[in-house]
Every structure is written in C-alpha cells, then in structure tokens.
Design a protein with these regions (language model features):
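Conserved P-loop NTPase mechanochemical-coupling segment
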Residues: 12-21
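Extreme N-terminal starter segment of soluble prokaryotic enzymes
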Residues: 1-4
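A short acidic, glycine-rich active-site loop
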Residues: 23-31, 153-156, 203-204
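Conserved small/polar residues in nucleotide/adenosyl-binding loops
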Residues: 205-212
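Active-site metal-binding loops of divalent metal-dependent hydrolases
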Residues: 7-9, 53-54, 92-94, 135-136, ...
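Short, glycine/acidic-enriched loop or turn micro-motifs at the edges of active sites
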Residues: 11, 56, 186, 211
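Core catalytic region of metal-dependent phosphoesterases/phosphodiesterases
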Residues: 21-123
C-alpha cells in the first residue's frame, strides 16, 4: 500500500511581505501544496492522510475564513482525484476552527473517497483500519480538572488520550493493517527552540504497522 502523509498546511495570510496585495508567505504555502498535488498525481497513492492544522488561524473574519476553506477544498479535491481515499483530520482548535471544518465537510458530502474527521473514530478501508485522533481543546480539559499544575495537567491529559486510543484500538479489525492518525507532540521531543528531537522509549498501546502524526 502506498500512503501519502501530510499535515500542518497552515493555509492563510501570515506576517511577512506582500506584493500587489498578495501575502507572499501565504502564496508560498499554496505553491508548496500545489507541488504536493503534483507529486500525488505522479505517485497515485492508495491513501492520503492529512493530520490536521489545515488552517493557520481559527479566529478570523468570516470572509477570509471562507476564502481559506475554498483554497483547502481545491487542494483536497485534487488529491481525491489522484488517490484512492483521502482522510482529513481537524488539528488544534487555535488553527482549525469548528466552523471552517463544518464548511469543509459540506463541500465533500457527495465525494465518496474523502472523509473530513472532527471527532475520534475508526475508518475502515479494504483491510485497513485508520484510528483517527484529532486535536483537542485544552480549555475543555482544564474546565474538567481545574487547578492542576503543569505536570499534573500533562499527566491527566496523557491518561485521557491514552484511554481514547485504547477505545479506538478495540474498534480496529483484528486482521487489519492499523494506522494511528493523530495531532500530538511525541513525548521526549522539544522543538520549541530548535529542530533537534530527542526520542525516548515510551509506553503506548500497540497498533500494528504505522503511525502518522503532526504538531
């Protein structure tokens, strides 16, 4: 099986230079996504997984948000013509707004090989189980567990996510190739001030074959 995994598109205007009213950093992003489409058409993957943060900013005016949704729609639609199936997952709420993803869902209701996912679920496709774990709103968990320190909060959130993953695992076919699709930081990594990643052994629920994630 050939899989194309991508994430963190961050479509939208960013701080930077412009030319004739066109934000050049935003245009660079679209140029990169068009190159992604070109590669997909050449490689013809069986499955495209888009692991969240499609948009750069959630809280923007409706007109601009609509324009960015249309830009995302065009890229996803082109990917759907190049691939067998496409799964697009919502990332973190500060980037991927609920409103934008609801609009995106509407565009693909009649496109059978595209699924837009905003809640944890398992998607089964011809012997492949994709366990999809979208980003979450920390504010929801902080309201549920108020007054926790940073370490306690991380421990509680890790436990909550672990329980969700275990639940998804029970929904996967026992003989299926299983893929975990998520939008979370890998424990042991710190990339806030650089590009060096330190990976340490972690305990995790065994999901056979593959994991695709983003941050």
């Amino acid at each position: 099986m050939k899989i194309l995994h991508t994430a963190d598109w961050h479509i939208g205007d960013k701080h930077g230079p412009s030319n004739n009213g066109v934000n050049l950093r935003a245009q660079d992003t679209l140029n990169c996504l068009n190159e992604l489409v070109r590669v997909a058409k050449e490689e013809k993957p069986d499955l495209v997984l888009v692991s969240g943060d499609i948009f750069d900013t959630a809280e923007i005016m409706q007109r601009r948000s609509h324009q960015e949704v249309l830009q995302a729609r065009n890229i996803i639609f082109q990917l759907s013509k190049a691939a067998g199936n496409v799964i697009v997952m919502r990332g973190t709420p500060n980037h991927d707004s609920e409103w934008a993803f609801e609009e995106l869902k509407g565009h693909f209701e009649l496109v059978p090989n595209v699924q837009i996912v905003t809640q944890p679920q398992v998607i089964t496709l011809d012997g492949v189980s994709v366990a999809v774990l979208p980003g979450f709103d920390r504010g929801v968990f902080r309201a549920k567990y108020p007054g926790l320190g940073k370490e306690e909060e991380n421990e509680v959130l890790t436990g909550e996510i672990s329980n969700i993953v275990k639940g998804l695992k029970t929904m996967c076919g026992t003989d299926d190739l299983t893929i975990l699709m998520a939008h979370y930081t890998v424990p042991g990594c710190n990339v806030e001030s650089g590009q060096v990643m330190m990976l340490t052994p972690v305990s995790y629920t065994h999901l056979r074959a593959h994991e695709t994630s983003a941050h």
